[in-house]
Every structure is written in C-alpha cells, then in structure tokens.
Amino acid sequence: MPGGGVTVKDVNQQEFVRALAAFLKKSGKLKVPDWVDIVKLAKHKELAPCDDNWFYIRAASTVRHLYLRGGVGVGSMIKIYGGRKRNGVCPSHFSVGSKNVARKVLQALEALKMVEKDPNGGRRLTPQGTRDLDRIAGQVAAASKKS
C-alpha cells in the first residue's frame, strides 16, 4: 500500500471523503440518476442540496461508512443520514433520510464493483473496494504530510 500501510481510519475523514468523491467523479463510471438536481435528501430538509456534486459526496461517505462497519443496509443508511424534523411550534422529532437516495447510491456502487451484497444482510465492501479506499487514503495522507 502506498503511504506505508495507511488505512481510511488514519486520515482526516473530510479530506478523505472529498478525495474519494473526486476519484468517483473523475472515473466517470458512477451512474448518477437524472433526478439528482431536483431532489431533497430527506423529508426533514427544506431545500435541495446546494452542491452539484452531492451524489458523489454521498457515495463516498457511504463507502467510507461501509469500510468502517460492514453489513450495513438501506435501513441503516437512512438512519445515518437522518436528522431533526422541525415542526414549527410543536416539538422536534427525528426523521430518517431518503430511502430512494440511499438505495440508488448503493446500487451505483454495486455497479462499480466496490460494494457487494452480504449473505447475512446488507452490503459490504469488495476486496477491490477496500484496496481502492486504502490507496486513496494513502494519497490523502501523503498530501497532508506535504502541506
């Protein structure tokens, strides 16, 4: 592994997610749905995301989460990307994220062969996906060491 055995856990996570999103976008293989520019990411959100590359960032964040905890499915992903639903004068409650977005991200990552279905339920990283993530983590570590 480049970077002397650096893994995803060893680098700054925000920089890693940004680098992985750039890698996914540059590869051009991630299938992005047509509706990405008009969708909200959860029912508790008031507006659609401002960033045009949000699908790549969500995919990178999802892959990172699968690296840290394998066997995670769509149900777990919608809880991770959930948040506080503001109900005006009524008390706030937790609201889950969009199930369709979580499912489409996982399906797109499966098409890239980074993620596969786990026989015990959920999804897990493939060996190729783990290799790619460790390689990108090594690049992030080397870049942060230079600056």
From Swiss-Prot:
User: Subunit notes for this chain?
Assistant: Component of the small ribosomal subunit.
Q: Mind listing the UniProt keywords for this protein, alphabetically?
A: Cytoplasm, Nucleus, Ribonucleoprotein, Ribosomal protein
Which organism does this record belong to? Ictalurus punctatus (Channel catfish)
Could you state one GO biological process linked to this protein?
Answer: translation
Name the principal localization, coarsely classed: cytoplasm
Question: What name appears for this protein in its UniProt entry?
Answer: Small ribosomal subunit protein eS19
Where is the protein found, in the record's own terms?
Cytoplasm; Nucleus
Q: Which Pfam family, any one, appears in the UniProt record?
A: Ribosomal_S19e
Q: Name one GO cellular component term.
A: cytosolic small ribosomal subunit
Q: Does the keyword Transferase apply?
A: no
Q: Which family does it belong to?
A: Belongs to the eukaryotic ribosomal protein eS19 family.
